[in-house]
Structures are given as C-alpha cells and as structure tokens.
C-alpha cells in the first residue's frame, strides 16, 4: 500500500514544529535537518510515460538555509496583564499569567474561594499556584560583576577635599571637586541639603560621620534607616584620617524625602576649622565657606560646651549672618548641639541650654539669640554606662551599653529623617540686593546654583585686596563690594543711553567727540563722589582709584567706537555733498556745450551765451534742490529706522 503523499505545505508545517521544539531545547545550528522517520517515509511523484509511479527516497539531503547569525531580540521586562506596567511585587498563576499583587487583589472575583485568573478566567486548583516571581528570581545563580566594574563601583563614592589649607595658612578652593559633588546627576537640578559636622579634632566626629553614612543608604532605599552593622557596607565608610585640614565632602548624594520632593543629602566634614593654630583671617574665611557648604550643622563637643566652642559658634553665627545678607541666604537653618560624655546626665537638653544661657550673661549675644529660638536644639549624650537625655524629655536611668547604642541610633535616625526639611534655601521674599524676587520652591537652591554661588565667593576671596580679621571687617568689605558693583552698573547704563541717543546720523553729528568725552568724564566724577562717601573700609582711597580706572577704561572703549562712528557719519554726508557738487559742474559744462551748438547753428553767439548762463543757473538750482531733498530723505529714513526698533547696541557682551 503506497504511503500518503506529503505536500510542501504540510512538510514545512511539520518541519517548523520540529525545529521550534529543537530551538527551544537550545539547538543553535543555522541548518535544518529533516528527521530520519520523515526522510524515509517521504514519497515523491514521478511521471513516466503518462503514468504516475511512487518513488521513495532513502534519505533526504541536508537543507541549508544560510540564515547566518541573527542578533537576539531585546527582551522587555515582564509587565502586568492588568495595568500593563512593570510588575511590582509580582505573582504568577499556574496558567502562566503574571500580575501585580495589588492589581490581582483588586480584580479578584469576590466570593471565589480558589483564585481565578482575571485574564483567562481559569480557576487554579491550589493556592500554592501563587508563586512570587521575586522569590524565584532570588533562586537564580547570581553572576559576579566584572573586576573592572567592581573597581569602578568601589571608587565611585569617596570623600573629597573641597577646601585645602596649605602650609602657609592660605586656603585653596578646589572647584573641580565641588563641581563633581554638587553637579552630580542626582544633585544638579535637585534641592540639596548639606549635613555638616563641626567640632574639634579627636572629639568623635569620625564616629558620628560613620553612623550617619551607614544610615543614609538604608533610608534612601526605604528601610528603617538604622545604621547597619559595621562591615556590612564595604567601601561606604567615612573613616578616621589624621589629615583633616580643610573641608571634606562625600562625593555621592543620597536622595531622601517624599516622591516628587526629593532632596539630595551630602555629608560634610569641616575638619579642623576650629583649630586655634589658624590665623583669624583663615578662620573667618573657613566660616564663610562652611556656611555656604552647610544647611544642617551639628556641633559635636566632648563632655560640655567650653568657652572656645562658644567663641567659635559666636563667630560662625556672625559670619553666617553677613554672608546671608550679601547672598540672600538663610544664615542658620538648623543647628544641633551634641554634647558627648556629658556629666550632666540627670538634666535634659533644655535644662542644659538654660545653664548655658545663664553662663553667657551677655558675653555671646548671637549665640544667646540662637539658643533662645527654634533653630537650635541640644542633645546630651552620656558615656555608654550612663543614660541618654534629649532636649524635650529625659529617659529613665540605664547603665548598659545597649541602652546607649539604642538612643544613639535613635538620634541618627531623627537627624536623617528631618534632613530633607532643611534643604539649602534663600531668604523668603528676596534673594539679595539687585536680584529677582523668589517665591515658593524657587527659594530652594539646587546643586548647580549652589556651585555657582561658591564660585562667585571664591572669585571675591581670590582678589588681591585688604585682609580681614573679623566678621565686621568682612561685612565692611562686602558692603563696599556691593557699592562698587552698583557704581559700575550705573555708569554702564549711562553709556548705553548715550549710545542709543547718538544712533542717528544727524544726532551724532551734533555731538562732537570732545563733547562726548566731557560728558562721560563729568558723569564718572559724579558717580565716584556719590558712591565714594558710602565706602566703609579703611582702604577707601585704593578702592576709589581701582574703580576710577575701570570706569575710565570703559569710557575709553566707548569713545574709540564713538569716534569711528562719528567719522563714518561725517564721511557719508561729505560723500553725498561731493556727489552733488560733481553733478553741478557737469550740468554747467553740458549747458555750455548746448549753448555753443545752438550759437554755431543759428549764428548768434550772444544768445548762446545767454542760454548757457540760464541753463547753468537752472541746473545749479536743480542740483541744490536735489541735494536738499536727498539729505532730507536720509534723515527721514534714519528717523523711521530708529522708531521701528532697529537699535543695535554699540557695546555687545560676548
């Protein structure tokens, strides 16, 4: 009995099914081979002499498709069959459909004991069918990262030196490191909170920074935020280093806060800015830079607040107020007084603040005003065998180290939880003198904006000028700086007005270069006299001389351009007049030739001369009228061009 004939369509269908099964099992060959059972059973039809005879083939030749290597298509992440978004807390049913656990609970048929698939309506026989995809993914073998990538991740986050103190006591601001931190992709366009730890050396700052740094990643990921055990985060540790001269910052920001209101939190170590070995000028400048690089300060002291701590705090608050007034920023947003190993273990933080205020007795007025307000709070951290006391309430006595660790971690969690509320911000209602009004969230400074403000501050500090040894002298220099900038802007505005007023040709011709030079000189002297009286620094004469030199240079640049423009306008008018005179001479010569021709033809030389004279007079009058009309049209076109808004400034900024 002959075998049934296998058509080409059936052959391709059966071949595709077999090959799909083999491909699923991992066969990556580019050539397809017909199975042996089909190769032997395949019957071909041969026509011989008008009759068909069946002829079987013992073997089927290998079919080469020559597909070559094809790139595997990109696999999209699994999506929920209900919300069509990426799976969140996914579950998988026996039917093969995946859902978010929240979507599945919402669309589950009420009253159905067994789970029913919302897509295919298939009822699962066992509740074991709800298997979490996340748990199954955890069972997959984890591939280690390449060594190069591991090294990159290890060095990506580190503490960077922002402000260095050289051997002579001078400050070196490293703008490259500042830009690397504040212009990080997570902080460039995001409000920033700079959590700065102040204090003397060997006062436990590294211990505090380590716990803050270990708690930030867990809080960022949504965990409880408690510091993890030591060693659980390799590479994320502040560490103790004897070379702490200067200001340091952790290079990687941590995004904290609610969704849509994230704040990039940085950790800052002020190093030895409180060292008495530094000069007064260096300490004042470090206080100014610390104010710019912090929005949440923690003054870490040992045992109790000493007179040196209060003196430094007084200077810091004074400098912060001066900087805040000049740059339009909030001077002190939040300050914690953390007293470690306190001997006043039976008092609360508020009681300790009262003792401090009584001790001050008007010696440090700015510190007293700060402690009386709501911007500062005090925490007493006793030794591990003593109890913990905060500002609001006192805890029961405890003599175990576990109690100390518990309360210390509670303080760390409280600091990290409230840090997003103290992002770097400008003063409410204004930024600073001469700047636009800020409202709402625009008061919060992003990383890029703060980096620009620090660059402006470094430009002022880097100028060779008189030194200052106190916040008052610094305030006087900043006041004089504002006055100098105001004088420059006033003179620039006057020059711009003169530029606009002399745009037209005939308006410029009415003001000679010497006259314009006298006008600029008079205005310069008036500005110097008016703003020079308001200067406060002792080096008033040097400041006025430098300002006069800058104004004189700007006036000279304008006069050079104005003189060239005046000469160009004068040459244009002279060219028009010269063209008119040439036309007049040509008219006279032409009239004379016409008169001579008429005289020769008519034989009346006298009449020809008279005609020539008359023609000359007529032509001359026509040329004069034409010249006047031309000049009038030029002036009219100039008026229309100026009134139409075509006012190109003479001075352009690159």
Swiss-Prot record:
Pathway: Protein modification; protein ubiquitination. This is RING finger protein 112. It is a multi-pass membrane protein; Peripheral membrane protein. It comes from Mus musculus (Mouse). Auto-ubiquitinated. Keywords: Cell projection, Cytoplasm, Cytoplasmic vesicle, Endosome, GTP-binding, Membrane, Metal-binding, Neurogenesis, Nucleotide-binding, Nucleus, Synapse, Transferase, Transmembrane, Transmembrane helix, Ubl conjugation, Ubl conjugation pathway, Zinc, Zinc-finger. GO terms for biological process: embryonic brain development; G1 to G0 transition involved in cell differentiation; neuron differentiation; positive regulation of glial cell differentiation; positive regulation of neuron differentiation; protein autoubiquitination; regulation of cell cycle; response to hydroperoxide. Residues 189-420 form the GB1/RHD3-type G domain.
């Amino acid at each position: 009995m002959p075998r049934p004939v296998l058509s080409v369509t059936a052959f391709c269908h059966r071949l595709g099914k077999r090959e799909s099964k083999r491909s699923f099992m991992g066969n990556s060959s580019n050539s397809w081979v017909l199975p042996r059972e089909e190769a032997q059973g395949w019957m071909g039809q041969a026509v011989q002499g008008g009759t068909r005879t069946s002829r079987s083939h013992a073997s089927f030749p290998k079919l080469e498709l020559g597909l070559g290597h094809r790139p595997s298509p990109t696999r999209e992440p699994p999506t929920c069959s209900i919300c069509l978004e990426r799976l969140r807390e996914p579950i998988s049913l026996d039917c093969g459909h995946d859902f978010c656990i929240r979507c599945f609970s919402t669309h589950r048929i009420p009253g159905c004991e067994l789970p029913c698939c919302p897509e295919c309506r298939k009822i699962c026989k066992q509740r074991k069918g709800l298997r979490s995809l996340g748990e199954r993914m955890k069972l997959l073998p984890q591939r280690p990262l390449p060594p190069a990538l591991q090294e990159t991740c290890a060095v990506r986050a580190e503490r960077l030196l922002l402000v260095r103190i050289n051997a002579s006591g001078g400050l070196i601001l490293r703008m490259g490191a500042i830009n690397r931190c504040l212009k990080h992709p997570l902080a460039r366009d995001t409000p920033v909170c700079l959590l700065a730890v102040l204090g003397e050396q060997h006062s436990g700052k590294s211990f505090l920074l380590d716990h803050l740094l270990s708690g930030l990643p867990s809080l960022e990921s949504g965990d409880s935020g408690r510091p993890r055990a030591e060693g659980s985060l390799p590479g994320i540790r502040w560490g103790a280093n004897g070379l702490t001269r200067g200001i340091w910052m952790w290079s990687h920001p941590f995004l904290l806060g609610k969704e849509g209101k994230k704040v990039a939190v940085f950790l800052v170590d002020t190093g030895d800015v409180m060292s008495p070995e530094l000069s007064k000028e260096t300490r004042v400048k470090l206080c100014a830079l610390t104010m710019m690089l912090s929005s949440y300060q923690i003054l870490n002291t040992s045992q109790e607040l000493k007179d040196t701590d209060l003196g430094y705090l007084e200077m810091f608050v004074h400098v912060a107020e001066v900087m805040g007034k000049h740059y339009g920023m909030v001077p002190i947003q939040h300050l914690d007084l953390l007293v470690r190993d306190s001997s006043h273990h039976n008092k609360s933080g508020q009681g300790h603040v009262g003792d401090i205020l009584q001790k001050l007795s008007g010696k440090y007025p700015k510190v007293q005003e700060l402690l009386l307000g709501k911007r500062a709070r005090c925490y007493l951290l006793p030794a591990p065998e003593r109890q913990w006391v905060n500002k609001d309430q006192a805890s029961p006595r405890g003599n175990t180290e576990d109690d100390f660790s518990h309360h210390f971690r509670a303080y760390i969690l409280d600091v990290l939880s409230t840090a997003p509320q103290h992002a770097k911000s400008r003063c409410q209602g204004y930024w600073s003198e001469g700047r636009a009004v800020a409202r709402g969230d625009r008061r919060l400074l992003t990383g890029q904006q703060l980096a620009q403000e620090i660059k402006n501050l470094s430009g002022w500090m880097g100028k060779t000028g008189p030194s200052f040894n106190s916040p008052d002298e610094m305030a006087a220099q900043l006041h004089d700086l504002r006055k100098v900038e105001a004088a420059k802007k006033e003179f620039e505005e006057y020059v711009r007005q003169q530029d606009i007023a002399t745009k037209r040709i005939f308006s410029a011709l009415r003001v000679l270069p010497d006259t314009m030079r006298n006008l600029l000189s008079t205005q310069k002297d008036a500005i110097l006299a008016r703003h020079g009286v308001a200067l406060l620094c002792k080096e008033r004469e040097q400041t006025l001389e430098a300002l006069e030199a800058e104004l004189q240079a700007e006036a000279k640049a304008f006069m050079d351009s104005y003189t060239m423009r005046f000469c160009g306008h004068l040459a244009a008018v002279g060219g028009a007049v010269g063209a008119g005179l040439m036309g007049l001479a040509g008219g006279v010569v032409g009239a004379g030739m016409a008169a001579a021709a008429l005289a020769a033809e008519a034989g009346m030389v006298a009449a020809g001369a008279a005609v020539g004279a008359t023609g000359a007079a007529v032509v001359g009058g026509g040329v004069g009228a034409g010249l006047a009309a031309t000049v009038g049209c030029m002036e009219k076109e100039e008026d229309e061009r100026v009134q139409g808004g075509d006012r190109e400034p003479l001075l352009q900024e690159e």
